[in-house]
Amino acid sequence: MKFIDEVKIQISAGDGGNGVASFRREKFIPRGGPDGGDGGHGGSIYALADHNLNTLIDYRFTPVFRAKRGENGRGSDCYGKGAEDIVLRMPVGTIITNDLTGELVADLEHDQQKVLLAKGGRGGLGNLHFKSSTNRAPRQFTHGEAGEQFELRLELRVLADVGLLGLPNAGKSTLIRAVSAARPKVADYPFTTLYPNLGVVRVDAGHSFVMADIPGLIEGAAEGAGLGHRFLKHLGRTRLLLHVIDVAPFDENVDIVHSARALVDELRKFDETLYRKPRWLVFNKVDMLPEDEQQAVCTRLLQAMNWQERWFAISALTGRGCQALIYAIMGHLQQLQSDSEET
């Protein structure tokens, strides 16, 4: 199924039904009192988070939703029937904003989270409500209220604990295949990954975390070059970023340090908050280097980048170093959780 992560929709809740002016008409009761019933309420529109969904593609083809109006009231004190509500199922991680004002309407963070998007109009009042000691035969009634109408923007941001950053062909997809059950496409050409992939990394029977792989970034991504800029927003909810670097590129003219710095610059240009997230370096494809040069290459890169944070040397293809990496990630996430509980 095609991955669609941003759409616009129009929603219109139903109007309330009208009240009615009616009088009791029975044999031997020539002057029956008012018995006009109220109108039914219009249908409301809700959003419901569903963890079984992972794309907004359905809303690309059906962008307009209108709930029905409530029935009008009737005589004999009969109330009009309320209209049924509409429930729009959306993936967990969907952010809903008012497209005209930019106001946040809802952030669907949990499965089965239900949020009112547009409230149906209340039904009008029948003339029974207007009876008084001075007005025994009122003819007043009220019309139903209009339902709310909005133009909304739906934006899906995947929910993951760890996000993978890197240039095209850095080996991010191979890494997520190596440590999880996810099976993204892997090939020896740029932009094999065309949309985010999620993988659940099971460390042991009781511990796991979610890893997200987005399309590779290239220089100028913040201005729209390549594919990755569109998907950087999906890393906004992560708690840790892994900057995956290919230490053995096929093109020997590639300046690894320059490329790594360029990616970090793109991150900073796109979102300062994302740039400030905890970030580790992961040197991938070390198995492609002569064994006696592997440590020296990593050390040279660390010095050139003036890197003081955590780093790992792995081979996503052979699995070398991957176990130590995922245990370190799990420990980091547990520490973050512990710190948040203390505060």
Swiss-Prot record:
Entry EC number(s): 3.6.5.-
Give the enzyme class: hydrolase
- What subcellular locations does the record give? Cytoplasm
CDD domains from the UniProt entry: Obg
Q: What is its main location?
A: cytoplasm
Q: Which residues bind GTP?
A: 166-173, 191-195, 213-216, 284-287, 315-317
State any single GO MF term. Answer: GTP binding
- Which PROSITE patterns does the UniProt entry name for this protein? G_OBG, GTP1_OBG, OBG
User: Got a GO cellular component term for this one?
Assistant: cytoplasm
Obligatory cofactor(s): Mg(2+)
Q: What InterPro entries does this protein map onto?
A: G_OBG (IPR031167), GTP-bd (IPR006073), GTP-bd_Obg/CgtA (IPR014100), GTP1-OBG_CS (IPR006074), GTP1_OBG_dom (IPR006169), GTP1_OBG_dom_sf (IPR036726), OBG_GTPase (IPR045086), P-loop_NTPase (IPR027417)
- Locate the Obg domain: which residues? 1-159
HAMAP family the UniProt entry points to: GTPase_Obg
Q: Self-association or partners: how does it assemble? A: Monomer.
PANTHER family per UniProt: DEVELOPMENTALLY REGULATED GTP-BINDING PROTEIN-RELATED, MITOCHONDRIAL RIBOSOME-ASSOCIATED GTPASE 2
Q: Spell out the family assignment given in the record's similarity comment.
A: Belongs to the TRAFAC class OBG-HflX-like GTPase superfamily. OBG GTPase family.
Q: What is this protein's function per UniProt?
A: An essential GTPase which binds GTP, GDP and possibly (p)ppGpp with moderate affinity, with high nucleotide exchange rates and a fairly low GTP hydrolysis rate. Plays a role in control of the cell cycle, stress response, ribosome biogenesis and in those bacteria that undergo differentiation, in morphogenesis control.
User: What is this protein's record name?
Assistant: GTPase Obg
Species of the source: Nitrosomonas europaea (strain ATCC 19718 / CIP 103999 / KCTC 2705 / NBRC 14298)
Cite the source lineage: Bacteria, Pseudomonadati, Pseudomonadota, Betaproteobacteria, Nitrosomonadales
